[in-house]
From Swiss-Prot:
One GO BP annotation of this record: DNA repair
Alphabetical UniProt keywords: DNA damage, DNA recombination, DNA repair, Metal-binding, Zinc, Zinc-finger
Gene: recR
Family annotation (Pfam families): RecR_C, RecR_HhH, RecR_ZnF, Toprim_4
Domain of life: Bacteria
Descriptive protein name: Recombination protein RecR
Species assigned in the record: Xylella fastidiosa (strain 9a5c)
Amino acid sequence: MSTHLLEQLIDAFRILPGVGQKTAQRMAYHVLEREREGGQRLADVLSRAIEKIGHCTECRDFSETKICAICANYSRDRHQLCVVESPPDRLAIEQATGYRGLYFILQGRLSPLDGIGPHELGLDHLGQRLAAGEVTELIIATNATVEGETTAHYLALLARQHGIRPSRLAQGLPLGGELEYLDRGTLSHAFGTRTEVV
């Protein structure tokens, strides 16, 4: 019996974060032995998602439409713009706080050693949004890592260039911590006690 296809399936599972060889093997065998129908459903949904989910032209979040539901919602405060590194960070803030402004998702953080500069993060597009004059506060919600702090500093400079007050999430964020893994209470407190970036 050829195991070439089985090996490809195991390798395919390994693209997921935190999934090593052993876990990928368990997943592959589980799908083939006990969950073929679920595996087919997963394959179908994954295929459709890859085909149909793109990025919102306003905030760069994942969306099935040109403009996502948050950006299209005119009851949200268009004077506040919260910048986060990733869609899971946006989701964490949305679920844990009463924030009713808009977002901008960087899809990463500045990391010159990895070839990630302002262009890769869409900061030219962010600059255009800030220049439009609607935003009065830029809330910087990058992670408390070296790259996150570097990105926050760059964002604060960009905001000031456009006469916009930058603020940063405050207490409760552990150094080196990732927003998506914080509990709701900590994130809500940090969001509520954000400080102006100097």
